[in-house]
Amino acid sequence: MDLSFTTKSVKINGQNHRILLQNENGPCALLALANILILSPDHTRFSNELIRLVNKGSQISLKELIEVLADIALQVTDKPSTDISELLSLLPRLHEGLNINPEFNGSFENTKEMSIFRLFNVDVVHGWVINSFINENIDEKLSHYSYESAQRILTQAADINCGISQDENSDEVLRDAMHLGLFLNESPTQLTAFGLLRLREKLLHNKFSILFRNDHFSTLFKYEDRLYTLVTDFGYKNCKDIVWQSLDSVDGSCDAFFAGNFSAAEVNGQQLSTDIERDFGTGNLLLEEIQQIENDKELAKQLQEQEQERVTKFEAKRKIHSHKKNSEIHAPVKKDKFKRRSSLLNAKASEKEKSECVVM
């Protein structure tokens, strides 16, 4: 059976529209892109066919949607036929899942998947950004990491701490891993206060874009210096007054629902069950996302503890070495006695290091 999308009638600033709602795949990139093409005045001149399709009924099939988007892409592009064919072959992945890698300076790794959005002249943004002004020496460097490169550094640091691998820049890897782990631990919703501020400043008024967050894609709109995401959860299908959700806080605690004209919306308890999941609230992340966040927290905690233990051991050894040097000056020790004691200490230290290594 072909997958389909349910449509919903909304009125935005006095104009009637039909938008697409989420199906079982959740807030996918295909949905966010299609709704921008439907709503954005900058794109509607190319999307008449899509608007007609959505207005046709209460549901449209995934196959029909992809075919119409392919037709639109052929209209707007000036790329050679070979290039456009390769990009169009990626269209189904907008629904299935994309390889999107956010970088902690606010950009993305330049992948083929990102080229699809450029093809439709639609911006993709995120707010998972490190504030490089707090500690310029550390955070400026960390801001050039992406999510995937951060994961590689965390794994590499774990291997170093367990003695599995060692190289000349091990200290640098361990330092970066500790700070990256703390950053991931402090931003489990993949949005930071600094990143949210940057989005408000960067995005243009009355313009649409796609917000990437927690592997989800949302239709984002800036209206009068405030950010709003289009509400596409199927649970709100019958809530005509709920069109937008403000993006005011990192954890969703200050976010609110708004009508199509951006006035406060009233939630009817009979229409909407209180346990409906909100798209990006920390308490409503998908199960696998919660597990990933907990894994990141645990890894960050272990790395921090291991780094502290390493520093403590180094300081202890330095003090012992300093004490021995002073003892040698004031009370010389016989060579054979010193050798036996040194051998015993080295053996004990070796046994202790082996017992403390935990394979992660």
Curated annotation (Swiss-Prot):
Source organism (scientific name): Saccharomyces cerevisiae (strain ATCC 204508 / S288c)
Reaction(s) catalysed by this chain's protein: Thiol-dependent hydrolysis of ester, thioester, amide, peptide and isopeptide bonds formed by the C-terminal Gly of ubiquitin (a 76-residue protein attached to proteins as an intracellular targeting signal)
GO CC aspect terms: cell periphery; cytoplasm; endoplasmic reticulum
UniProt KW Protease keyword: yes
Further comment found in the protein's record: Present with 2050 molecules/cell in log phase SD medium.
Similarity-based family: Belongs to the MINDY deubiquitinase family. FAM63 subfamily.
Key words, A-Z: Cytoplasm, Hydrolase, Protease, Thiol protease, Ubl conjugation pathway
Superkingdom assignment: Eukaryota
Lineage: Eukaryota, Fungi, Dikarya, Ascomycota, Saccharomycotina
GO biological process, one term: proteolysis
Assigned EC number: 3.4.19.12
Coiled coil: none
UniProt-annotated catalytic positions: C28 (nucleophile), H216 (proton acceptor)
Recorded GO MF terms: cysteine-type carboxypeptidase activity; cysteine-type deubiquitinase activity; K48-linked deubiquitinase activity
Location relative to the cell: Cytoplasm
Function, in words: Hydrolase that can specifically remove 'Lys-48'-linked conjugated ubiquitin from proteins. Has endodeubiquitinase activity.
Site (Ubiquitin-binding): D296, L299, A300, L303
Protein name: Ubiquitin carboxyl-terminal hydrolase MIY1
PANTHER family noted in UniProt: NF-E2 INDUCIBLE PROTEIN (PTHR18063), UBIQUITIN CARBOXYL-TERMINAL HYDROLASE (PTHR18063:SF6)
